[in-house]
Swiss-Prot record, chains A, C:
This is Dihydroorotate dehydrogenase B (NAD(+)), catalytic subunit. GO terms for biological process: 'de novo' pyrimidine nucleobase biosynthetic process; 'de novo' UMP biosynthetic process. Disulfide bonds: none annotated. Keywords: Cytoplasm, Flavoprotein, FMN, NAD, Oxidoreductase, Pyrimidine biosynthesis. Belongs to the dihydroorotate dehydrogenase family. Type 1 subfamily. The lineage of its organism: Bacteria, Bacillati, Bacillota, Bacilli, Lactobacillales. It comes from Latilactobacillus sakei subsp. sakei (strain 23K) (Lactobacillus sakei subsp. sakei). FMN binds at S22, K46, A47, N102, N130, K168, I194, G220, G246, G247, G268, T269. Substrate binds at K46, N70, A71, I72, G73, L74, N130, N195, T196.
């Protein structure tokens, strides 16, 4: 029996549920040298901000048990360069690859400006509103830790966006549920879960943090149980679709997160361990489903029917 | 599509100086065109280490289908690697680094100065080999902590004269490479048609300063990396002329011209 | 040169800074069969509650990459049995081993009653106020996530306790600093950091959580970078001593956490991987210090002078 | 102080049925007094797996200084274990379990019924061996999924008659062990002086029910464990007579009398 890996989310008719996570795959040009990105279900590009950003000083990454810390600091060429170069490059080579644009900013006005502009790109099918970056002084967590601030920002972004807006929530909160509810009420099309936890490594020799930014975002296998918990928790209070992520490295991990309530899966850190992680997972999904006598995702994520 | 990932087999591994290992890996990566200065990114066989480890390519032997890495055990990853036995298969990405050491501009009998320190020296071996194969005359200037930690002395001396500096003076010149350059290679900027360097930051800064105007002088940088292919922006460095422009060491380097980037 | 591993904290003059973490070493009777507990710097016993508790249904543990989840649910024989049997058993065999009593409860009255009673045991040198257990319906996180509630509880417990009170904070909060500050102002002698993160694993076959309690506390190596960050963050706003914990398995891990600001180190999950983890770490500390030309902890943790 | 941790060496490892491995470990643990039903807790050689894996002791061979484990590959840990080659050293805790199968009460020529299912069967081998060594007459009744998954048939038949039930009827009785007991061992409660069981929950419940009044009937339980020594309270089970009293399977078990605990 052949498998049907398709999943359908607002704005996103995907041939399979697997997509590179924002910030772990640039704008596709690098990994695009090594395999055909058309294999992917979708692709979440690196955060776009209004102005070009240089990000933080180096070192920007450090290793942790079954995980890593990053403090890239949203380096990106800015919305204009992304509109002029990055998105057209993708559109030309991969006209059928749905792009999800990760959007960040310092102020509401920044977010709104970028959402309005980037959602007009013909290959951008959805926005992932990044209100959860732990590595920048402004924006990021400020909007992501208060239900009111998150709702106000979401509403403003939804109003100007031509495509559905998924809000990427932070795991670094006491209770994610009021934030998720507020964001849903403000018009979000779905959630993206989870961004990185905040962590630190110290060099015992210098007794200083390894990262120039001191703290960084913890990602990779180590955070998978936290991602499962938060996806499960948000699923328990909302029927909106969830793009799940956090420590997915195998088809088994992907199914576990989908069993928790995710409708599609983003893969971040695993790309670094294994550059072919995404195509490998996509290839392994039919056999993984077959282990449980399944051939599609229909019975996953309670809300799948609704879509 | 470019090739990227290889399953290489440990042919043999030897501790050639205290804590310095020579690792010979066999597999078809050895058939790829490798520019010296390019590197590989090795998956350490440990479930808990997600990040690969970058190492310069010290030797390519297409005839025997092997490449050689030389590395120092500094932390958990290199420790585990050093305990891997013959026959172990390793997933290796490479050759990585969009820019290795340029050598096409040199002609037979021209002269190259190769400056290195510690574990920056490995890629300079492949460089020197390629230069000598072209008929270029090479001079090596290497810095080490002490006599004990010197490795590949015979290999380099086979390729060309080699001057040593050690911190403690236990072998060669006493002091760091910068001082050795000042004292014994004061005319290097005009004597040599090309300058190549790899090593610790201090050494690179010394070379970058001394040969900032040399039209053919190159340094190779290191930085903590995640993807190794240019996708994650972990390993950036700023352009000297315009620090708002950032280059990725893994992809736009690891070799840069002197005076090109902020050290 | 010989090393001096002593550290000195309120109530705790320790011959070395290593102690088993609460809940990972019972009341000492089990590991006491296999090695001399006098080797330990101190020992934090399993949570004590007013009434005997049965804890949660099984399965109570699940594995995660470089970590584990537990949902024991504070099973313990209750304060009376602990006073009558567990503490005397320890006092008789290990008269010089400083015991830290982990105290939990449903209500402020529960906490106060247990603190008052247990702090009178002659071998209890300090209390670790557990306001951060994620695995119980009441108490635990309720007190641990609000600065006001944490302060009120701390004040009440400090008032009745005969020994210094260290407050064990939760990592599952948006910002730990106001909670730490409130607890300090309320009279805490120090902090204990960190309790477990909240996580979940799902059995892909049944699509149900593996743990009967659904969620569990994530501990082990995986959370080390989060522990380092929180210890560092609390150290940056307080000079109170910190008992640091979270993923310590080696002497190197212990030094890293001490470099972040911890004055002593508790070892939890590592006991399960390696039952001799604590004595092994203690034995390895002198060489680990010597790597950095150190022979004691004097230059660690900025507040060491103050004590 | 009691001994606890051993470094055992893999002597050999064989797949004796699909996905079922026989692992022989050599080292001085084999010199300890082991009660059948006791278990070991094995550190899987993977940096990312913190919890040890418990396995019943299937055989102790003091003369050759080895113990044998029999296990099924069900997840990551057993998969990695099955790929370990001869000579690999494993950290093993044991013998664990304060209560194995009591056999001292039995006299030569008395009769014991040993009931097992799937991977519950391994510790029953050591039990049967010890009983036979005492002169006790043993009867085995084992359940398997199908003929293919049966293991240690010759080993058990050497010790005593062995009846099989398979779910699909491909070997022996068709159906589960409970039905086989009803049909062919209806008088077991009076015929046998002792009853011992290990296997899946359903089997244990069947045995617990049928032999609840038998003065000498024992079942061995499994539960997810962390410490394996009684310190963490992960593996508790409740007493039938008073469910407010909880016992630890790792320490107060893993063997309990029938009718003793809530299943
Ligand atoms: C392009 C390049 C080429 C290199 N070539 C060589 C070589 O030929 N021989 C050699 O001995 N070393 C070389 N290095 C350094 C080598 O990568 C590190 O020594 C190694 O990664 C340390 O790993 P570890 O697990 O032992 O150390 P740990 O400190 O435990 O590593 C922790 C993390 O930090 C990273 N890291 C630590 N030190 C360095 C470093 N100096 N540079 C980059 N990342 C680091 C590791 O990759 C890992 O992600 C090179 C580095 C780069 C960037
Ligand atoms: C006292 C005792 C004796 C046992 N004896 C045997 C034996 O002789 N032969 C045999 O094949 N199996 C035996 N088991 C079961 C065996 O421990 C598990 O099959 C094994 O731990 C699975 O590990 P894994 O990594 O392959 O599976 P995973 O599912 O990946 O393991 C994840 C976690 O769950 C735990 N776990 C999973 N299944 C079980 C289980 N059934 N019981 C306890 N913990 C589990 C693992 O130990 C690990 O902590 C015994 C279990 C216990 C408690
Ligand atoms: C190097 C790196 C860069 C990242 N950059 C971004 C980013 O720009 N925007 C964003 O929303 N998330 C960013 N993330 C977070 C990931 O998209 C993802 O949410 C997180 O890493 C968890 O998934 P993983 O465990 O699969 O990596 C980044 C993560 C890493 C490791
Ligand atoms: C099985 C288990 C039981 C625990 N029980 C308690 C407890 O009773 N009280 C408490 O404050 N913390 C408890 N903890 C948390 C630990 O004390 C410790 O804070 C945490 O596990 C982090 O340290 P580690 O990574 O070294 O395990 C428990 C942890 C585990 C794994
Ligand atoms: S390591 Fe990812 S961009 Fe260089
Ligand atoms: S596994 Fe820890 S008490 Fe049984």
């Amino acid at each position: 029996m052949t498998s049907d890996l398709r999943v359908s989310l607002p704005g996103l008719e995907l041939k399979n549920p697997i997509m590179p996570a924002s910030g772990c795959f640039g704008f596709g040009q690098e990994y695009g040298r090594y395999y055909d990105l058309n294999l992917l279900g979708a692709f979440i590009i690196k955060a776009a901000t209004k102005e070009p950003r240089l990000g933080n000083a180096t070192p920007r990454v450090a290793e942790t048990p079954s995980g890593m810390l990053n403090a890239i600091g949203l380096q990106n060429p800015g919305i204009e360069a992304i509109m002029a170069e990055k998105l057209p490059w993708l559109a030309e080579r991969y006209p059928d690859l749905p792009i999800i644009a990760n959007v960040a900013g310092n102020t509401e006005a920044d977010y709104v400006a970028v959402c309005e502009r980037i959602s007009q790109a013909p290959n951008v099918h959805a926005i992932e509103l990044n209100i959860s970056c732990p590595n920048v002084a402004h924006g990021g967590l400020e909007f992501g830790t208060s239900p009111e601030a998150a709702a106000t920002l979401t509403k403003a972004c939804v109003a100007v966006s031509q495509v559905p807006v998924y809000v990427k929530l932070s795991p670094n909160v006491t209770d994610i549920r009021p934030i998720a509810k507020a964001v849903e009420a403000a018009g979000a099309a779905g959630f993206s879960l989870i961004n990185t936890l905040v962590g630190m490594r110290i060099d015992p020799k210098t007794r200083q943090p390894i990262l120039a930014n001191q703290t960084g975002g913890l990602s990779g296998l180590a955070i998978k149980p936290v991602a499962i918990r938060l996806v499960h928790q948000v699923r328990s209070i909302s029927n909106l679709p969830i793009i799940g992520m956090g420590g997915v490295a195998t088809a088994g991990d992907a199914l576990e997160l989908m069993a928790a309530g995710a409708n599609a899966i983003a893969v971040g850190t695993a790309n670094f361990s294994e550059p072919f992680a995404c195509p490998n997972i996509i290839k392994a999904l039919p056999d993984e489903l077959a282990k449980y006598d399944l051939h599609d995702f229909k019975t996953f994520a309670v809300n799948q029917e609704v879509l | 599509m470019l090739p990227l990932e290889w399953l290489l087999t440990i042919q043999d591994q030897t501790e050639i100086a205290p804590g310095i290992f020579e690792l010979r890996l066999s597999g078809d990566l050895a058939q790829e065109k490798v520019q010296s200065g390019q590197f590989v990114d090795v998956k350490i066989p440990s479930d808990a280490l997600l990040l690969r480890r970058p190492f310069g390519i010290a030797n390519v032997d297409a005839a025997h289908n092997t490449i050689t890495l030389l590395y120092r055990t500094v932390g958990e990853g290199t420790q585990i690697l050093s305990e891997c036995s013959q026959g172990t298969e390793l997933s290796v990405l490479g050759p990585l680094g969009g820019h290795g050491y340029p050598i096409d501009q040199l002609k037979p009998h021209q002269k190259a100065l190769i400056i290195g320190g510690g574990t920056g020296i490995p890629p300079l071996h492949e460089l020197s080999r390629q230069l000598v194969a072209k008929g270029v005359q090479v001079q090596h200037v290497f810095g080490f902590a002490n006599q004990e930690s010197i490795f590949y002395q015979a290999e380099f001396e086979k390729l060309g004269p080699t001057a040593y500096a050690t911190n403690d003076g236990s072998y060669g010149y006493k002091g760091h490479v910068g001082l050795l350059l000042d004292e014994q290679f004061a005319d290097a900027a005009t004597t040599y048609d090309a300058i190549y360097a790899c090593g610790p930051k201090g050494l690179l800064m010394a070379v970058d300063n001394r040969f900032s105007a040399h039209p053919n002088a190159y340094i190779s940088l290191e930085e903590r990396m995640a993807c190794g292919v240019g996708a994650c922006y972990a390993c950036v460095t700023k352009l000297k002329v315009d620090p708002t422009i950032q280059l990725k060491i893994c992809d736009d380097g690891p070799v840069f011209k002197t005076n090109e980037v902020l050290l």
